[in-house]
């Protein structure tokens, strides 16, 4: 049984930890609002761009279609771009994204495909390195980035397009977590290359609208598809930040509550042990007085 001094030290230690988790919860809550607003603001733009691409794609076929839209005609080599948080302490947020990417990689490898992985965020790299260290092609470290901007997504997009033009892969899939609410983030896989317009809402919007394009649709697609890749990556990064802050706020709230429960239990144990010690000392004093 621990001594009273040990119990006091443990209570003080848990209280100090509770202050830290409470502060982290408040910081995450403050960041969550801004991150959520940024993610929600990016959705209409990315969705509308997808709708425009779907509409233009209906007017382009054959040799006029850009390679980024039709692909290489093969699906032998797959590039997985896995976006996770740059830090931990956010529950199962990172592991859920990594699990989705890992399952997809295992499936492709079982089918005899070649898999290459680009990780965005330190935690995803740490998780996937345990099983797929030989498949890790590149890593994008955003730990020094204080304010996420489109230029960061654009750099990743240019890197992916350059690899595609060099013939490094046939299909590119983006993995991230779509923000739903503070307690709900959905791990998502989205095909970037070949550019896919399989979203029903985008197809319906594209079918309802009538556009006239100048210059020709193929020339527009050649410019718009690379832009769309960067836009989709930027949206994924913004969704990830919002999801990370939501998961971190929830995790730190649970940690703060658990610390409070532990403090209560330790305090009860401390008071009982202290009471027992006082009672024992009183009995010894009374026994000594009676002996005299």
Swiss-Prot record:
Bilayer topology annotation: Peripheral membrane protein
Top-rank lineage group of the source organism: Bacteria
Sequence intervals crossing the membrane: none
One GO MF term attached to the UniProt entry: ATP binding
Assembly: F-type ATPases have 2 components, CF(1) - the catalytic core - and CF(0) - the membrane proton channel. CF(1) has five subunits: alpha(3), beta(3), gamma(1), delta(1), epsilon(1). CF(0) has three main subunits: a, b and c.
Purpose of the protein: Produces ATP from ADP in the presence of a proton gradient across the membrane. The gamma chain is believed to be important in regulating ATPase activity and the flow of protons through the CF(0) complex.
Protein's name in the database: ATP synthase gamma chain
């Amino acid at each position: 049984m621990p001594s009273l001094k040990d119990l006091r030290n443990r209570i003080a230690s848990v209280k100090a930890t509770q202050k830290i988790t409470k502060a982290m919860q408040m910081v995450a809550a403050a960041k969550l609002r801004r991150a959520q607003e940024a993610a929600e603001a990016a959705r209409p733009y990315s969705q509308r761009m997808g709708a425009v691409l779907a509409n233009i794609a209906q007017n382009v076929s054959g040799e006029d279609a850009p390679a980024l839209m039709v692909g290489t005609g093969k699906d032998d080599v797959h590039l997985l771009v896995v976006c996770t948080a740059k830090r931990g302490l956010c529950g199962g947020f990172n592991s859920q994204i990594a699990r989705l990417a890992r399952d997809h990689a295992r499936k492709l490898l079982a089918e005899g495909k070649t898999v290459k992985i680009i990780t965005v965020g330190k935690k995803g790299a740490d998780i996937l390195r345990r099983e797929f260290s030989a498949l890790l092609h590149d890593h994008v470290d955003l730990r020094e980035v204080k304010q996420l901007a489109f230029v960061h997504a654009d750099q990743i997009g240019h890197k992916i397009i350059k690899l595609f033009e060099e013939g490094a892969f046939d299909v590119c899939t983006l993995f991230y977590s779509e923000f739903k609410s503070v307690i709900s983030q959905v791990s998502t896989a989205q095909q970037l290359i070949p550019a896919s317009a399989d979203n029903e809402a985008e197809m319906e919007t594209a079918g309802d609208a009538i556009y006239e394009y100048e210059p020709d649709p193929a020339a527009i697609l050649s410019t718009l598809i690379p832009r769309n890749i960067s836009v989709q990556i930027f949206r994924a990064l913004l969704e990830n930040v919002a999801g990370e802050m939501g998961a971190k706020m929830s995790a730190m709230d649970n940690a703060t509550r658990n610390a409070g429960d532990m403090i209560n239990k330790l305090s009860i144990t401390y008071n009982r042990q202290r009471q027992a010690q006082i009672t024992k000392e009183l009995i010894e004093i009374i026994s000594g007085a009676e002996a005299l």
